[in-house]
Amino acid sequence: MAVDQSSFVVLDGHHRVEAARAIGLRRIPAIILDYSSEKIVVTPHSISKEDVIRAALEGRKFPPKTTKHMISLEGHLFHISRIEPDVRLDIRALR
């Protein structure tokens, strides 16, 4: 799961959040990102980062797969999940 460091808006991993809630987890491993970084890009370009944050803070959800969050690494764009580490924890630690 990827989360903006300023607003704590979930950028990637919404389905994981819903699954975690459904099984009663109180904690969810996440990577905290500086969404204002120029290295992070939202597509399509018709939706801005500000649109994403504003919609989330107002409780408005975009339909699934409306946006993709990409990160520029060494001149190439990759889905943000590329930098999310594998997390292997005993699920009991998250309750």
Range-by-range predicted roles:
Residues 82-95:
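Glycine-rich, aromatic-bearing surface loops/beta-hairpins
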Residues 35-76:
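Amphipathic, charge-rich alpha-helical segments that serve as recognition/docking helices
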Residues 1-9, 14-46:
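A short, basic-hydrophobic beta/loop patch
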